[in-house]
Amino acid sequence: MARRPGSSSRGPARSDRLPTEAVTSARKPHAAAPTPPASPDPGLVLLGEFGRPHGLHGEVRLKSHTSEPLAIAGYGPLHASDGRTLELANVRPAAGSSPDLLIVRVKGVDDRTGAEALNRVTLAIARERLGEVEDEDEFFLTDLIGLTVEDGAGTVIGTIVAVPNFGGGDLLEIRPAAGGPTALLPFTKAFVPSLDIAGGKVVADPPDDLFAPPGPKPADDPG
């Protein structure tokens, strides 16, 4: 779960439903460990991504995107990006300093070959299973996809099509209203001073050259 840029955190949610406060795509990632974008399907919320196999008996590394990494095991069957429905078992922290890196076993996967097939597969949960957020400052990053982007004068400048994170913080990928290539805008209070998910829009203060085409390469640039 994400929060509006510049807002403060709150206490845990009620325990009589799925713990929505555990789901996040907006945590500050560890250096050199970029997180994947919010699910391109607005009906799904990303929970994690598998990595390399661990050992010979079906265990596999999993990067959890929940605020409590081990909580990912409590969501039951999950949507996998390869089209399968998968359920986790025997979840434990991996050795090392990254608390969001786990060693897990997937039900029905009992050997290294099966674990290798999971590498780079992502896990997601249906948005409706998470219920509604209880704090107006909280939302899921997937809720941003499809929102209209306006400037301070109320002029529509584009639409959010994705929320990637390459290690330096969440970004809004915006398709310009006038057409052309998308552009990336940092999802910070400075660039996105106002957010109205219920109203279907965000107000942005982008740089003037946000949608400007890249300039010519220097003559000595080997690329």
From Swiss-Prot:
Subcellular compartments: Cytoplasm
Keywords: Chaperone, Cytoplasm, Ribosome biogenesis, rRNA processing
Residues annotated as domain PRC barrel: 135-210
Lineage: Bacteria, Pseudomonadati, Pseudomonadota, Alphaproteobacteria, Hyphomicrobiales
Family to which the UniProt record says this protein belongs: Belongs to the RimM family.
Statement: the UniProt record of this protein carries the keyword Chaperone: yes
Annotated stretches, region: Disordered: 1-44, 203-223
InterPro entries named in the record: PRC_barrel-like_sf (IPR011033), PRC_RimM (IPR056792), RimM (IPR011961), RimM_N (IPR002676), RimM_N_sf (IPR036976), Transl_B-barrel_sf (IPR009000)
SUPFAM superfamilies: PRC-barrel domain (SSF50346), Translation proteins (SSF50447)
Gene Ontology terms: biological process: ribosomal small subunit biogenesis; rRNA processing
Protein name: Ribosome maturation factor RimM
